Amino acid sequence: MFDDQDEIHPLLAGAPQTTEFRKLRKRIVREVREAIETYGMVERGARWLVCLSGGKDSYTLLAVLHELKWRGLLPVDLLACNLDQGQPGFPATVLPEFLSRMGVPHRIEYQDTYSIVMDKIPQGRTYCALCSRLRRGNLYRIAREEGCSAVVLGHHRDDILETFFMNLFHGGRLATMPPKLVNEDGDLFVYRPLAFVAEADCEKFARDMAYPIIPCDLCGSQEGLQRQQVKQILDGWEARSPGRRQVMFRALMNARPSHLLDPGLFDFLGLATAPRASEERQDEPPHLRGEA
């Protein structure tokens, strides 16, 4: 299915012809298809706004979605979108030139949210939370303007797992990024088709394809300390017990509300025991109980 180089989307032209890369590519495609099917992301004839930051994850997402569409396996229109947030030194020509060369429909939007973030966040604090909120609001607006039904993000399995533990350790709740949700206004879906894909696979895929990666440290902000700490914890667990990340991720798909403590998820007040067999027999007539 994926070996004919004469019938391939330009985003995957020049892919390494090694057995290792073929296996990687097929695994990522399979996991993306599984996420799309499991969470019912496809509405035939829909239009998706595929968010492209220039990082390894969003390049992987864009390539795989276009590959699926190219193969007739994703019956939706795709519009790539990059939000240039005015960060100093951002290479503004990289993405539009790349997307044009690949023949990918796209929209490049400039919004100086960087100045807002710098004005609102004290020096020494992480900018990521406010930056993300401003970016999300602009992406929703663009999606509406472009007639899109969904905003598609490049969060992968490790992002989802890290967010779960951040909420557990620091937020006091069991929650993470779901693969599919509806925005607060109720008019747009938000999809994460890379939900089942490991970060390491995204990194290797983008590196092997030699996509022009744009780092996320141009504004001088580093990733939040809490996320870095969680990542280090998970890395340690994975090193001591390979496969631990995948086991924990599967647990997020196997919740049992009756074995947790949230009365909003399970009706503990209405919980009742079933009558014992001996008690049921007391209600029977004597001749049916063998006493006549």
From Swiss-Prot:
Entry-linked Gene3D superfamilies:
HUPs (3.40.50.620)
What Gene Ontology molecular function terms does this protein carry?
4 iron, 4 sulfur cluster binding; ATP binding; magnesium ion binding; sulfurtransferase activity; tRNA binding
EC number(s) per UniProt?
2.8.1.-
Q: Which residues form the signal peptide?
A: none
Biological process (GO) annotations held by this record are: tRNA thio-modification
InterPro entries xref list:
Rossmann-like_a/b/a_fold, TilS/TtcA_N, tRNA_Cyd_32_2_STrfase, tRNA_thiolation_TtcA_Ctu1
Q: Source organism's superkingdom?
A: Bacteria
Q: What class of enzyme is it?
A: transferase
The cofactors it requires, by name, are: Mg(2+); [4Fe-4S] cluster
**Manner of cofactor binding, per the entry note:** Binds 1 [4Fe-4S] cluster per subunit. The cluster is chelated by three Cys residues, the fourth Fe has a free coordination site that may bind a sulfur atom transferred from the persulfide of IscS.
* One Pfam family of this chain: ATP_bind_3
Q: Which reaction does it catalyse?
A: cytidine(32) in tRNA + S-sulfanyl-L-cysteinyl-[cysteine desulfurase] + AH2 + ATP = 2-thiocytidine(32) in tRNA + L-cysteinyl-[cysteine desulfurase] + A + AMP + diphosphate + H(+)
Annotated binding of [4Fe-4S] cluster, by residue:
C128, C131, C219
| Annotated localization | Cytoplasm
| Stored CDD domains | TtcA-like
List the coiled-coil residues. Answer: none
Q: Does the keyword Phosphoprotein apply?
A: no
Question: Its pathway?
Answer: tRNA modification
Indicate the quaternary assembly: Homodimer.
Family per UniProt? Belongs to the TtcA family.
Q: Which purpose does this protein serve, as stated in its record? A: Catalyzes the ATP-dependent 2-thiolation of cytidine in position 32 of tRNA, to form 2-thiocytidine (s(2)C32). The sulfur atoms are provided by the cysteine/cysteine desulfurase (IscS) system.
Another remark in the UniProt entry says:
The thiolation reaction likely consists of two steps: a first activation step by ATP to form an adenylated intermediate of the target base of tRNA, and a second nucleophilic substitution step of the sulfur (S) atom supplied by the hydrosulfide attached to the Fe-S cluster.
Protein name, as recorded: tRNA-cytidine(32) 2-sulfurtransferase
Q: Which organism is it from?
A: Cereibacter sphaeroides (strain ATCC 17023 / DSM 158 / JCM 6121 / CCUG 31486 / LMG 2827 / NBRC 12203 / NCIMB 8253 / ATH 2.4.1.)
